[in-house]
Amino acid sequence: MIESIASLSVAGLRERLAGFSVQAIDADDRQRAAVALALTETGHGADLAGMPAFPEWNTAPALLLTRRALTLRQHAGQWAMPGGRLDNGESPEQAALREMSEEVGLSLDSGSVLGRLDDYATRSGFVITPVVVWAGAARDLVANPGEVASIHRIALTEFLRDDAPILNQVRGAAHPVLRMPVGNAWIAAPTAAFIYQFREWILLGRPTRVAHFDQPVFAWK
């Protein structure tokens, strides 16, 4: 377990991730995608109901999350991490960094990559690789309006809540749907699955797999 969230460091996270045994999933006829699980600073807060705002810049560690643009054909308005399909010849790391630059205007080099978490196969036909990235303060983010409705800095302590995760059975699913509460709302898998595994294995030192958790029905297409 990392002794204090406030004491998170690049070296410490890189070491913890180096000891993580990643479970990869063969894509078969599915499309490869990657997301950036980007660690940044809380800044002025998450800009969400039920979460505090800070008049002065807060350097406590946070995750960088987005809400997808309402104009998108798939998964409009859903919580997400910067990410998308791999271009021909790209690695998941390259794709995650490219998508972060395109979606939120944050350009980082390969040295910011700390490691990977487990792949997750979605019902919509993707195998997603989460790439953990150290984003620094990331003070000048700009949402690409064609892809991102809003950008949020969610303090890591929010994901340590006692009521997380939320597990529910739904008809037609063999395994529970996993959600993570945030403020007065919640985030669904696959994004919630990546957050939960990062919390359990990397922050708390509890080996946890998440690929079996299902998504809510609205995310099946």
Locations of the language-model features?
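NUDIX/MutT-family hydrolases
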Residues: 143-181
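N-terminal leader/linker segments that precede catalytic domains of diphosphate-processing enzymes
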Residues: 1-80, 85-102, 106-139, 148, ...
